[in-house]
Amino acid sequence: MAGREGVPILRNVRRLPDPTSRLLVASDAAHRLGGAVPSPAAAFLITLIVLPSLFWLVALKRTTGFTVPEEWLMTNLVPQVHSWVQTMAPPLDALLIGISGLGSGWFVAAGFGVLGLLALAKGRRDLALVLAAGTLAFPMEWALKFFTAIPPITPLQLLNALFDVREVGLDDLADFPAGHALRASVFYGLAAFCVARLAPDRRQGLTAYGVAVLLIGAISMTRIYLEAHYPIDVLGGWMAGAALVSVIVAVHVLGLAERIRAADALAAASDQRPRRVAVPLRHRRES
């Protein structure tokens, strides 16, 4: 019995897998591309598709407000579903409210800060810059709400709404775009991109993108469930967030590709230089 004191009791039990064990956090990983990282051309193509669509959606919102199917949905169906869930399944209602909070301004701002500091701690300044650029989602939301508000609002009203002066927030002044949908698209989209940059396995990156899409969709649907936004507002948040993410990703990947191309050209030039053969000094004297 004394000889068995140092033997672990659960020696045959496998350890839980570490989801971050296969991520590349070394400094040289910042200069490599691979996995599920999109190309700059694909990112810019998404931008070229989304931005004009967002423009026409803004024009539709300013001229019509909402469509007839949306009005029927938000008048006849959503309120009944919301009331039924509140009455028959209060835990589900609390869960949906909690999911909605994952796209709130304070949560997303804190998330950007935590992930940015984590990237710096791992020596990945490139990803920290990507996350810092993601905070542009906030002024982007404010600008879109300012220019699409009906009736128009003043800059002072917008400033007061940012701090909930007199309990009047941004959503009380302008519905378009849905701020939760926009912020969630940018935050979780860029977080998934960072995982794809760190993961050598393409499947890990695709899994991260899939989880991000599910989170964005769940957060956005809760805003409709809570009767805070019409579907057109949520669609506008998705488009605005996708446009910002695609621009940030394209700039990041294009800059990295240029650095890799320059390093390869420098290495090729150094290999093509004529090499001088070193001759020992005593051999020169004998000759």
Where are these regions (language model features)?
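N-terminal transmembrane-helix/juxtamembrane module of multi-pass inner/ER membrane proteins
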Residues: 2-110, 147-148, 152-168, 286
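Membrane-embedded catalytic cores of phosphoryl/pyrophosphoryl-handling enzymes
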Residues: 3, 158-285
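Transmembrane alpha-helix boundary/anchor motif
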Residues: 5-8, 53, 135, 139-143, ...
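Interfacial segments of alpha-helical transmembrane regions
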Residues: 43, 47, 112-140, 209
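Hydrophobic alpha-helical transmembrane segments
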Residues: 57-58, 100-123, 185-189, 196, 223-224
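Hydrophobic, membrane-inserted alpha-helices
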Residues: 93-94, 109-117, 192-193, 215-220
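Hydrophobic alpha-helical transmembrane segments of integral membrane proteins
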Residues: 123-158, 214-231
